[in-house]
Amino acid sequence: MLKDFFSKKKRYATIPSERAKHDIPEGIMTKCPSCRTIMYTKELKKNLYVCDSCGFHHRMNAFDRIESLLDPGTFVELDKGMTTEDPLSFPTYREKVEADRKKTNLNEAIVTGEGTMNGFPLVIGVMDARFRMGSMGSVVGEKITRAIERAIENKQPFLLFSASGGARMQEGVLSLMQMAKTSAALERLDRVGGLFISVMTHPTTGGVSASFASLGDYNFAEPGALIGFAGRRIIEQTIREELPNDFQTAEFLLKHGQLDRVIPRSEMKDTLTKILDIHHVS
């Protein structure tokens, strides 16, 4: 009996049910990765996915961006059905692409089309980093090239928002060829006096930053966007020097003359409209 008195009582933890864990439906709230503020996702969307507390620019999907910029009902998508054929039969590539299609409701990492912005007609391309990290494969390169050719044909400006991890490794040299292909198409646009506005968003890296994204008549970026070719760690190991904390940010590139302006998302449409107005030929 004395032994029972001194023995430890078993303690039991209450494990919350699965239902309790999901009292708040997924996607209702979003936490800012910069200041950790938690906000309603629908309020964040109303604010163009910019944090009210610290101004952090969250990633924006392609159709939300198009909706925020173009006049309602004017957008007509181009080449929607184009999909990759896995030219190198790369292991698990088809499965990963199919998974991204289901997750994003996109066929590829870019949406291209035509529309008007405050009445000014243009051709637009918007990359979406949710699909294979926005990587550039043969379909992405082809869609950009066709959009540029449409701008040439219609004598309209071409506006492109970049968001990419670079060339798509699963397509090998075919993805690298898109750097030259898109750059050559932009040269043809320039030759006929066409306007190309490039807006780099987070992230714009690798072969995309080294080709069409940096070839605009105007090169803009969103605040805090990561923009560069090789990764920070690789550069530091190569030059054996420590790089500044703001290296490869939009602000760093602006300071060193590689961008024309860093534009907050709330000012993007007005700024682009002014440029379209300046270059508009009636």
Swiss-Prot record:
<feature type="zinc finger region" description="C4-type">
    <location>
        <begin position="32"/>
        <end position="54"/>
    </location>
</feature>
<keyword id="KW-0808">Transferase</keyword>
<feature type="binding site">
    <location>
        <position position="54"/>
    </location>
    <ligand>
        <name>Zn(2+)</name>
    </ligand>
</feature>
<dbReference type="GO" id="GO:0003989">
    <property type="term" value="F:acetyl-CoA carboxylase activity"/>
</dbReference>
<keyword id="KW-0547">Nucleotide-binding</keyword>
<keyword id="KW-0067">ATP-binding</keyword>
<dbReference type="InterPro" id="IPR034733">
    <property type="entry name" value="AcCoA_carboxyl_beta"/>
</dbReference>
<comment type="function">
    <text>Component of the acetyl coenzyme A carboxylase (ACC) complex. Biotin carboxylase (BC) catalyzes the carboxylation of biotin on its carrier protein (BCCP) and then the CO(2) group is transferred by the transcarboxylase to acetyl-CoA to form malonyl-CoA.</text>
</comment>
<dbReference type="GO" id="GO:0016743">
    <property type="term" value="F:carboxyl- or carbamoyltransferase activity"/>
</dbReference>
<keyword id="KW-0443">Lipid metabolism</keyword>
<keyword id="KW-0863">Zinc-finger</keyword>
<dbReference type="InterPro" id="IPR041010">
    <property type="entry name" value="Znf-ACC"/>
</dbReference>
<feature type="binding site">
    <location>
        <position position="32"/>
    </location>
    <ligand>
        <name>Zn(2+)</name>
    </ligand>
</feature>
<keyword id="KW-0275">Fatty acid biosynthesis</keyword>
<protein>
    <recommendedName>
        <fullName>Acetyl-coenzyme A carboxylase carboxyl transferase subunit beta</fullName>
        <ecNumber>2.1.3.15</ecNumber>
    </recommendedName>
</protein>
<dbReference type="Pfam" id="PF17848">
    <property type="entry name" value="Zn_ribbon_ACC"/>
</dbReference>
<dbReference type="GO" id="GO:0006633">
    <property type="term" value="P:fatty acid biosynthetic process"/>
</dbReference>
<dbReference type="InterPro" id="IPR029045">
    <property type="entry name" value="ClpP/crotonase-like_dom_sf"/>
</dbReference>
<dbReference type="GO" id="GO:0009317">
    <property type="term" value="C:acetyl-CoA carboxylase complex"/>
</dbReference>
<comment type="pathway">
    <text>Lipid metabolism; malonyl-CoA biosynthesis; malonyl-CoA from acetyl-CoA: step 1/1.</text>
</comment>
<keyword id="KW-0862">Zinc</keyword>
<feature type="domain" description="CoA carboxyltransferase N-terminal">
    <location>
        <begin position="28"/>
        <end position="282"/>
    </location>
</feature>
<keyword id="KW-0276">Fatty acid metabolism</keyword>
<dbReference type="InterPro" id="IPR000438">
    <property type="entry name" value="Acetyl_CoA_COase_Trfase_b_su"/>
</dbReference>
<comment type="similarity">
    <text>Belongs to the AccD/PCCB family.</text>
</comment>
<dbReference type="GO" id="GO:0005524">
    <property type="term" value="F:ATP binding"/>
</dbReference>
<feature type="binding site">
    <location>
        <position position="51"/>
    </location>
    <ligand>
        <name>Zn(2+)</name>
    </ligand>
</feature>
<dbReference type="Pfam" id="PF01039">
    <property type="entry name" value="Carboxyl_trans"/>
</dbReference>
<dbReference type="GO" id="GO:2001295">
    <property type="term" value="P:malonyl-CoA biosynthetic process"/>
</dbReference>
<comment type="subunit">
    <text>Acetyl-CoA carboxylase is a heterohexamer composed of biotin carboxyl carrier protein (AccB), biotin carboxylase (AccC) and two subunits each of ACCase subunit alpha (AccA) and ACCase subunit beta (AccD).</text>
</comment>
<dbReference type="GO" id="GO:0008270">
    <property type="term" value="F:zinc ion binding"/>
</dbReference>
<keyword id="KW-0444">Lipid biosynthesis</keyword>
<feature type="binding site">
    <location>
        <position position="35"/>
    </location>
    <ligand>
        <name>Zn(2+)</name>
    </ligand>
</feature>
<keyword id="KW-0963">Cytoplasm</keyword>
<dbReference type="InterPro" id="IPR011762">
    <property type="entry name" value="COA_CT_N"/>
</dbReference>
<keyword id="KW-0479">Metal-binding</keyword>
